Amino acid sequence: MDSSAGDPGDGVPSKRARTERDPYRVETMEFLVLVKSELPDDVYSHFVRSMIKIRRQRNMSIEKCKEIILEILDGQPEAIQVFEHFIQGYSPCRAKMRSKAHNFVERVKACPDISREDFHALLNVLAKYYKNEIKTSEEVLEKVERIIGNYPEFLEEFKIFVPHHLRAHLPNEKSCTSPKSSRVSETFVSFTLDAMNKLDGLRVKATNGRNQATPLKYTQDQNQNHEGRGYSLRHKQTKRTTGLIENPRKQGDDKSPHAEDDEEHKAEPLLQWSTSRENELPLKVDPSNCKHCTPSYCLLPKNCVTLQSSYQTELGRSILNDSLVSVTSGREDCYKFRTKNQYEENMFKCEDDLFESDMLLQRFRATADFIEDLQYRFGSNVKIQEHLTPLHKRCIEQLYDDSGIDMLDALSESENTSSALAVILSRLNQKIGDFSEARLSLNKMCPDTVANNYYRSLDHCSPSFKQLDMERMSPKALLAEDKQISRIKSHTDIHIHEDVGVIINYAYSRSCSTEDKPMMNWTKLVKAFVSVKFQWPDLKDTVSRRNVCEHCGMSRDFLNNIPVAVLTNEFVFSSKEVESLRAKSNESTSSLDHFDAEVEEGEFIPDVENIQLRVRCLPTNNSMHSTYGHWSGSEEHKSSRDDSNNEVGSSEYFGRTSKECDANRGISCCTLAVLCRLLQVMYERLLVAKNLSEGASTHDSYAHFKEKLCSLIDGSTDNWNFEQHCLKFLGPNSYVLFTLDKLIDRVIKQICKIYPSREDSSVLQRQERSRRTFNILKDPALPARRTNSSKELLHHQNARGTSIELPKQGREEAKGGCESHGDTGKMKQNHFQRRKKRALENGPPSFSQPGSGNQAHN
Amino acid sequence: MDPSSAGAGGNSLASASCGDAQKRRVCYFYDPEVGNYYYGQGHPMKPHRVRMTHALLAHYGLLAPAKMEVLRPLPARGIDLCRFHSDDYVAFLRAVTPETQLGQVRALRRFNIGPDCPVFDGLYAYCQTYAGASVGAAVKLNHGTHDIAINWSGGLHHAKKSEASGFCYVNDIVLAILELLKLHERVLYIDIDIHHGDGVEEAFYTTNRVMTVSFHKFGDYFPGTGDIRDIGYSEGKYYCLNVPLDDGIDDDSYQSIFKPIISKVMEMYRPGAVVLQCGADSLSGDRLGCFNLSGKGHAECVKFMRSFNVPLLLLGGGGYTIRNVARCWCYETGVALGEELQEKLPYNEYYEYFGPEYSLYVAASNMENRNTNKQLEEIKCNILDNLSKLQHAPSVQFQERIPETKLPEPDEDQEDPDERHDPDSDMVLDDHKPTGHSARSLIHNIGVKREITETETKDQHGKRLTTEHKGPEPMAEDLGSSKQAPTADANAVAVNAPGNARNEPGSSPK
């Protein structure tokens, strides 16, 4: 200590600051002071020189270091005790002074001349000092003198704790005012710390003393605690005022009070929890009684009693909020806030299994490592209970199941635990092996589970989307949607158009392969309609209100704008009939056509509104009748129509309307609008797929997607796998593609409506598709079947080439028969189809008879 | 570390502007024991996620001393916890055990210990560990030796002064901010956990020295606080911002509101340090969350805060789908370091959690975004309007702080020239240097502690011994030897490497 006098004066404040900032430095200083006071001078010098040597030998082990030091301190039990405390991280002074304080209080209590009342009064003074009710040491000394003044030996011993503090107080103040401290001042600073620690020891004892209180004393403690808390509030206010006053001071002056405050707090022991403390806690504040300042905060009443912190720094007291509290609601652990799909739940279960397995494995491993460390470092002379953490104890308890607690008790009681540790370690390692094997099993199971559930766990939209999409794809919805959509659209991606055509062609070829020519027509038809959409901007120029159909919003001139070449080249209609269709479509019968279309689909339900529409159409029918008078000459035809209408109870006028609708059933603007809308939707979705594939990391995801879609269409893959592919390679936003197969089905169905000659074969198509699917499942020789289909196609094409018109006439006749017979008509229809087939097989001669009959009829 | 870096630390106080390309000096706090604490079967909070994060960092090679400094934290002492929490609360946490809790129903209710915040083995030690890491990280930032400090085990933002809340017992964020306030006049706290950061906000609700900004799900959701009209009180008025959001918010929507608001905050408030709570329960697919952020979207906030080049403290927080939490925080550690990590995860002992893609990136789902552009625009206008009412940064001169900051340096140089080469050794030296003693005495204590540290380090490395759990004070000896479970050889090597590197300068002859 003498050698430190040479330090520069201006360094003292920073040194002091750093000393006070770091408790380890203080403890080291305390340790050295005690050792020097305990040891003879020569032993102390030897001690210091040994420390220097130890520092120079950097690779010295901890055990050897302790061995050397203990050898030097041999014969000095108190010094050894101080050293042991220091090594374990406790304050040496604190431990020593705690022992002295305890001794002092015990002897005062044991003295027969001091009454119990006086003894309790002494404890009371110390307790009050501890709780800051008595603020100054002078007051403590004064009260103690009054209590035990008659016993000089006790009073003199008590002064060991107090007089240094009193004497050091004045020099300490002096050192604060002086920038340079003298050698003597430093000595006093050191003693001041020593004195504070002595008082600290005394306070600790005072706390312990309360535990010995009588029931009456207990009651007094309660009251005191209550007063203490009240004082704490006042104390806080005083501190704030003090802080305000101190703010204008110089920086250097501000530093000392803050540092001193920290020092004092560090010295005080933490509050010890006891079960009796539970009853003394003030109740939690009831928010409903408090004034709300902002939505989530309420202002605490001024007289509110809340739990306090004795260790807040000056900074903390000035900044932390203790006047408002927030009002929370609910629990963080609550699962109801988000709807999770089952796949997500499966992922969570898998994760939890891995987690629980890992926790067991890691904790047992940590305990085993810890015990190995114990064995290595301490051999058999160790009280294991002192070193085990709660986690280690829990592991050992679980290790022995029902006997776990007994095992822990045995460990704590036994003196020689090395053998027990060896047994426990062996059991732990065995358990670790078991857990490791279980983990390996999980490692094999989990990949399958996560692979099956991960992609779908990211999908929260597709279930509701599928339901909505079915409704959205109905003709009514499509027509309503079409009216609202602006027709001016720019479709810049021609490749998507080609893809739409290719896919529909593929889908159609999968559904029916018995006739080659119709397939070719469908391919070109789709292309035609796709290209028609490019002309929609032109249509707008010619659109007027009078010419717009009230149901689909499409211009009645739509057909007029379709290139004649398209219809002529691709349809079986003759030029004459095309002209006729155009003329008919210009009339107002399109609305009735719409009704009939819905009847066919089983969606139409007659209501007042529809009947009114029919009534409004009557005058137009009359006009048309007069225009096309040539129909009235066919008495036989008209008569048959009337008969069928009578069966449904229609009047003569309705009969006429029905007849005219039949003529236009093959093609109407609404039907075309639905088809265009479906193609539009399909375009949009393929565009989504293409955009998503561009964002995907996999190369050429779009091509793979199209392959997968074709597989779905031909039945080689199912919906689940198709959806899995989309989610995996195109991401969770690809859910809009999940209904593409249904969308394509509707497109095919809609195309069949537009081509009248194929309308009757829609049932046949479905039968063919079902039969084909069945065959795909049963017959692996698919190529062979395709060869047969090809031959059949050639045969039919050749047959049709010689008499293109006659089959159409035959079909019309068959359809008429169907209507007149209701449900049984379907069976008859099948009968007619079978008859037709046989007729075809008989060759041209069989056609001449019905052909000539039809001609005569016309 | 050369003196110029110390100067750079000083510059950060003045918020000097640096390009993003510049490397940040990062320190990372991790305690190997933290993953062993267990809230209970079926409880969503799993400290194990921090251990998983650490394993990913190790196998990506981010724990190399050349990349960042890895530190094992000193557990916070009871006195340190009482800087914010009340005496009785801390005393109760220290004393209560699963066995003794049954007889203390009244106290459990008073301190809100229950299903959300259960009593489990080692509860108090767990609190000491993560709080000590956060405070230690703040101290590192104060020293100016690092630009970014990370503690993924921290970020427990719900804890109140005298009660636990929302899986949180000790509010390490408040303690860390109090530490930062010793040096910085203003500290900014940003919370991107899906839950409102109510504990931190309440603690600083009446002061203008801390600004709290929380982006959270609001409306019939825990903790129920965080109304946009909660703007602070008294001196703290307008220094509290709450950004209420709705289900399904995605990356673009989130950044469209986060970046404008935080840019304005940084301009108006000019904090000396920023604390960013990176709760990962705002990610898509979280067990308790309902947002739809991808891992990259979540990390965009970290990247944005890093670009301001203000001392930055990164803390963990919520996050209950642990396979997503580990990847998110690993990715964000890479962001802090400026490292581009490969998407394919390296094999590690937790590899099976991350199937089937084994990707570093957390994917967003296709759930509906209920935040409309109009709503977000309204919220943004409201927040920016409150910000415009702020005084434009309090008028305290930075110069007043500089002398105090530099004051300790000359003395350290005079007493021991080696200290500049080993800042952590500086901490160790400070621990044991008594005032008023001769230089010889100083050398004695330095030698004693250093030898103990070195010896223990070697023991741990050679024999993979688990460090005995001593009292808080001796943990100073382990400051330079952060430790990992012995079975992970790569981890052991990576974790111990920084300690070895730090010992080299100290062992060089004077």
Curated annotation (Swiss-Prot), chain B:
Cofactor: binding details: Binds 1 zinc ion per subunit.
Domain of life per record: Eukaryota
Catalytic activity annotation: N(6)-acetyl-L-lysyl-[histone] + H2O = L-lysyl-[histone] + acetate
Alphabetical list of InterPro entries matching this protein: HDAC_PDAC, His_deacetylse, His_deacetylse_1, His_deacetylse_dom, His_deacetylse_dom_sf, Ureohydrolase_dom_sf
Biased composition (Low complexity): 485-503
Record-level GO cellular component terms: nucleus
Region (Disordered): 394-510
Induction: Induced by drought and salt stresses.
Tissue expression pattern: Expressed in roots.
Keywords associated with the record: Chromatin regulator, Hydrolase, Metal-binding, Nucleus, Repressor, Transcription, Transcription regulation, Zinc
One GO MF term: zinc ion binding
Pfam families per UniProt: Hist_deacetyl
Site (Polarizes the scissile carbonyl of the substrate) location in chain: Y320
Residues that hold Zn(2+) according to the record: D193, H195, D281
Stretches for region Histone deacetylase: 24-338
Extra remark: Plants silencing HDAC3 exhibit reduced peduncle elongation and fertility.
Purpose: Responsible for the deacetylation of lysine residues on the N-terminal part of the core histones (H2A, H2B, H3 and H4). Histone deacetylation gives a tag for epigenetic repression and plays an important role in transcriptional regulation, cell cycle progression and developmental events. Histone deacetylases act via the formation of large multiprotein complexes.
Sequence similarity: Belongs to the histone deacetylase family. HD Type 1 subfamily.
Protein name: Histone deacetylase 3
